[in-house]
Amino acid sequence: QVSPGSKTSAMVEYVDVLPTFLEVAGGKIRKNLDGRSFFDVILGKKNSHKDYVFGEMTTRGINKGSSYFGIRSVRSENYKYILNFTPDVTFQNACTTSTIFKSWSKKALAGDNTAAEKISRYENRPAEEFYAIQEDPYEWNNLADDYNYAMHKAKLKRELLRWMKECGDKGQQTELEALEHQGRKRQSKDIKRAEDTG
């Protein structure tokens, strides 16, 4: 049913994958699922699926992660808004201990300004980020403080806060409680690590 080589720029989320698989398999999609099937997009019957897609990330309790650094984001067709809960904390994860990242660090120490900028951008994140992703797909130019985009930023921020409320996401409070929702063995290990690193 799907044309070979089909492509789409429709925005979908991970939560949409399960209902899509269910529909493809001829199963019944329960109303309590968070996602919506994008089977019609795959079939070429629709060109779009959602007006906004949302993202979340935590470093709390993950491999090589900061003690806590929560990130939430929302994207529309043209713009992306990112909310970083703790901009005063250095962002860390498994990538910051990778061979590639270490090679950037080595270059930065040797005076390579490009490498130094990449490291700084990755580890030191501002409270808000806003990108015009059609013109800036790699998100280099943060427009969060640009007055010309203030209305677009405010609109996406409202959508993000609405979504967080709908999900019961209390922002930093949810981040700090993350360890309580992990397995006991992992939880005790991560609580000790969090206490050791402050």
Regions found by a protein language model. Name each.
Residues Q1-N32, R36-D51, N141:
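Substrate-binding rim/cap in mid-to-C-terminal beta-strand-loop elements of soluble/periplasmic
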Residues V2, F38, T59-I62, Y79-Y81, ...:
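Short, solvent-exposed loop/turn segments at secondary-structure junctions
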Residues V2-M11, A25-R30, T59-G70, A116-I119, ...:
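Active-site rim elements
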Residues E13, D34, K50, G70, ...:
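Residues that flank catalytic or metal-binding motifs in active/ligand-binding sites
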Residues V24-I29, I42-K46, N78, L83, ...:
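A generic secondary-structure signal for well-formed alpha-helical elements
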Residues G65-Y68, F85-T86, Q92-C95, N141-A144, ...:
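Short conserved micro-motifs at the rims of enzyme active sites and ligand-binding pockets
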Residues Y79-A116, H181-G198:
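Core domains of carbohydrate- and sulfate-ester-processing enzymes
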Residues D112-E128, I133-G198:
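Long, internal low-complexity/basic segments
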